Amino acid sequence: MAADVLSDRLKTVRLTGAAFFEIAAEAPWAVASPPREMILPRILPGADHLIAYHAVTAGRCVANVAGSPPIELQAGEVIVFTHGDPHVMSSSPGMRADPPTTDVLDVAAAAQVPFLINYGSADAISAKLVCGYLACDARLARMLLAGLP
């Protein structure tokens, strides 16, 4: 029964845009996802609501969100930030990274998809991720995502 309610709600949410990129990283590494107010106008202009996601395709990593315990992820796992909150993906818990500058976001927006980000040597990659942002109507997103963290 609950699956039917979720299916009905998912049918009402229309994605209005998407952007994605790949990360190949050698430990130690850390990359910050900036606030949605910085991302939306550059990567998904005109979008109302931002959902960020990271799918670990190889190795391990950690998702760090201010005020929350780190979440360890391994290959095959996905983490979704339903409200597009700023966060840091890294090789170890508690690592920090400066958010990308607006110039970097502009380059990413103009780049061919997927945009590839390399940290370190290709011979010593400890993690690979497919990351991205989904845009949808804010009103419908609130209805669907209201009960999620």
Stretches with model-predicted labels:
Residues 84-85:
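Extracellular beta-helix/beta-solenoid repeat scaffolds
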